[in-house]
Amino acid sequence: YVQPSVGLMRFNFVLILLGVVGLIAATLIGRFGPGWYMLYPLPFMTTWAGWSIGVAVISVMLLGTAWLLGQLDLLRAIVGRYGLSGMLGWQYFRKGDPGEDLPPMVLIVAVSMIAGAATTIVGAVMLMLYLAQWLAPELQFDALLMKNAVFLFGHTLVNITMYCGIAVVYELLPT
């Protein structure tokens, strides 16, 4: 229905590849235990190699950057085709002819990308704080706040992935 930027998607592919390779290296070589989950303050335990903490955090930052850029580019493409009010289906609340039909897939993706972009920014702030603590171990943060940021970032990401996956299934089903 829309055309995202091919160049940006290729750049995102490289960022995602680097992020995944970094996480694999931190986990398998550096024995970084928390994996991608990284519930605070677990990443800063001294059970694994110190470098693996930084590699894991930077890797998830690369992944988050790629996801945020992709989300924003999809939103840009949808707004370019359907307009801001059109992508959210507001035309159906007005009297009269709504004009061009909004495919359900576009509405689902638009709403998912708005939620995803907002919570990916929360995840970016959280990861910058993780990076700051890795560079300056004397820093300490509120564990409950960090836990909530991890959950908001991670669970929203998983949910929008499910929503978009279900939208693809609906799109493929015969009408």
Predicted regions and their residues:
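Hydrophobic alpha-helical transmembrane segments of multi-pass integral membrane proteins
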Residues: 1-175
